[in-house]
């Protein structure tokens, strides 16, 4: 072997993919990081994806490939991409290769970990079921989240996934003692900037003292290589807190679909034959390798919340469909509900959770949740009749069901603290026991006399009563 690191020469550049020729016997391993010195302290990192034969490798660039020329020198680092881990990352913004992008100097860390790692073995995993209270009525009641579980937020364009994630950060990360890692994968840079400023204002990020969150970004403007790997960077930082510090970590990923999308952009350039809908043939494997690492072990837990963009509102598209298989709880945001003006636009009949089980949530919660779903389902099946014949043709019992369902539907809406600037309504956080009690009372008909408007955009049932009195006073 040679004394220094092996070096090769660029042979071809095709978009985000670079072919590099090495000397005999100096071939870098798959997933190794290669670097190209671009002058003025700029280094471009590539990751080896394929061996082409004839001592050539095909690598994916983690940044733009503008300005590269054939014959330029490429150095093999001899190891995968590694990123700083530990408390030095808290309060900082990091890119895919672990460099700070917040212009606040280098990151102080004693350790760097490779972004590719094996998932914890089956023996190490923990399987306890415990509900994570979010303070969002529709979630806590109908599709509760698991502490240390995986949660998916599914929705098309513009139905409120990012606002929902921000509300969860607001409700859980603030009340939660441990650390959080927020990973922005292929989403809007503006939203990342807003989030950072908001976290500074609320003290989640403290520039002087100890912060509670590390931010990792590879946004829409980045090349596909960065977007396909930045989720792993964020996960590596979260894994360190889980395994080395025994923490309960919150991992937010916005958006996991962009991870798949970036993989499909690169896949064609790597010469793989596409599978269904043009996705990469390795779609399920890529997703599995990522998702299996996001798990709770005996050392600590990772509770992950992932936003999943649904292309063209089609939940059967291979990308969202593959993601469904990995999750404990799914919150489906629906365009139909957002068009009714009900926010959060959660579909109460489509959202599911593994925890909605008598043995986990208890009999009362289970009965109220199923009662709410039955009422809404009955209303859904009566909607065609109402559309054709009108309300007057329904039986008295059906009329009552419809009235209650419309109240429940409105009562599932809730003002968010993070949306206060847009709505002008103060955000509300509702405790689980209050949610169960108030929906139970609505199902029992105790509030049949109140107008349905009173149930819209409020917190608990006492707010409904107050709003009803206000409506009555205005009417007189």
Curated annotation (Swiss-Prot):
The record marks 351 as: Required for activity. It is an enzyme of class 7 (translocase). It comes from the Eukaryota. CDD domains: ATP-synt_F1_beta_C, ATP-synt_F1_beta_N, F1-ATPase_beta_CD. ATP binds at residues 156-163. Disulfide bonds: none annotated. It catalyses: ATP + H2O + 4 H(+)(in) = ADP + phosphate + 5 H(+)(out). Its main location: mitochondrion. The keyword Transport applies. The keyword Mitochondrion applies. SMART domains: AAA. GO terms for molecular function: ATP binding; ATP hydrolysis activity; proton-transporting ATP synthase activity, rotational mechanism. GO terms for cellular component: mitochondrial inner membrane; proton-transporting ATP synthase complex. Keywords: ATP synthesis, ATP-binding, CF(1), Hydrogen ion transport, Ion transport, Membrane, Mitochondrion, Mitochondrion inner membrane, Nucleotide-binding, Translocase, Transport. HAMAP family: ATP_synth_beta_bact. F-type ATP synthases have 2 components, the catalytic core F(1) and the membrane-embedded component F(0), linked together by a central stalk and a peripheral stalk. The central stalk, also called rotor shaft, is often seen as part of F(1). The peripheral stalk is seen as part of F(0). F(0) contains the membrane channel next to the rotor. F-type ATP synthases form dimers but each monomer functions independently in ATP generation. Belongs to the ATPase alpha/beta chains family. Mitochondrial membrane ATP synthase (F(1)F(0) ATP synthase or Complex V) produces ATP from ADP in the presence of a proton gradient across the membrane which is generated by electron transport complexes of the respiratory chain. F-type ATP synthases consist of two structural domains, F(1) - containing the extramembraneous catalytic core, and F(0) - containing the membrane proton channel, linked together by a central stalk and a peripheral stalk. This is ATP synthase subunit beta, mitochondrial.
């Amino acid at each position: 072997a040679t004394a220094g690191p092996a070096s090769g020469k660029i042979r071809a550049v095709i978009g985000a993919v670079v072919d590099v020729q090495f000397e005999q016997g100096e071939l870098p391993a798959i997933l190794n990081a290669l670097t190209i010195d671009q002058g003025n302290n700029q280094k471009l990192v590539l990751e080896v994806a394929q061996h082409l034969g004839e001592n050539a490798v095909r690598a994916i660039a983690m940044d733009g490939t503008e300005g590269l020329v054939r014959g330029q020198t490429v150095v093999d680092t001899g190891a995968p991409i590694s990123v700083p881990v530990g408390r030095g990352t808290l309060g900082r913004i990091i890119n895919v290769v672990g460099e700070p992008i917040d212009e606040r100097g280098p990151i102080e860390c004693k350790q760097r970990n490779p972004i590719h790692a094996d998932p914890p073995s089956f023996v190490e995993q923990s399987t306890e079921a415990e509900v994570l209270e979010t303070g969002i009525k529709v979630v806590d009641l109908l599709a509760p989240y698991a502490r240390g579980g995986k949660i998916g937020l599914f929705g098309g364009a513009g139905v409120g996934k990012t606002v929902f994630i921000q509300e969860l950060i607001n409700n859980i990360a603030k009340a939660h003692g441990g650390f959080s890692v927020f990973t922005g994968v292929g989403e809007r840079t503006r939203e990342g900037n807003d989030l950072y400023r908001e976290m500074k204002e609320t003290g989640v990020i403290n520039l002087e003292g100890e912060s509670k969150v590390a931010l990792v970004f590879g946004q829409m403007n980045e090349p596909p290589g960065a977007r396909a790997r930045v989720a792993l960077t964020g996960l590596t930082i979260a894994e360190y807190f889980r395994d080395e510090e025994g923490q309960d970590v919150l991992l937010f990923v916005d958006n996991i679909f962009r991870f798949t999308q970036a993989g499909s952009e690169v896949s064609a350039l790597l010469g793989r034959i596409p599978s269904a809908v043009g996705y990469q043939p390795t779609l399920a494997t890529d997703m599995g390798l990522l998702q299996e690492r996001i798990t709770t072990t005996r050392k600590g837990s990772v509770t992950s919340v992932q936003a999943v963009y649904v292309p063209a509102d089609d939940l059967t598209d291979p990308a969202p469909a593959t993601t469904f298989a990995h999750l404990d709880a799914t919150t489906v945001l629906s365009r139909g509900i957002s068009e009714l003006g009900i926010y959060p636009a959660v579909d109460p009949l489509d959202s599911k959770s593994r925890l909605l089980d008598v043995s986990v949530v208890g009999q009362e919660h289970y009965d109220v949740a199923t009662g709410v779903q039955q009422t809404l389902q009955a209303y859904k099946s009566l909607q065609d009749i109402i559309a054709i014949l009108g309300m007057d043709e329904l039986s008295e019992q059906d009329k009552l069901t419809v009235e209650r369902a419309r109240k429940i539907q409105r009562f599932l809406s809730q003002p968010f603290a993070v949306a206060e600037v847009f709505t002008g309504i103060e955000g509300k956080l509702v405790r689980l026991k209050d949610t169960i009690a108030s929906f139970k009372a609505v199902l029992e008909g105790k509030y049949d006399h109140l107008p349905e408007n009173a149930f819209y955009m409020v917190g608990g049932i006492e707010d409904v009563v107050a709003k009803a009195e206000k409506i009555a006073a205005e009417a007189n």
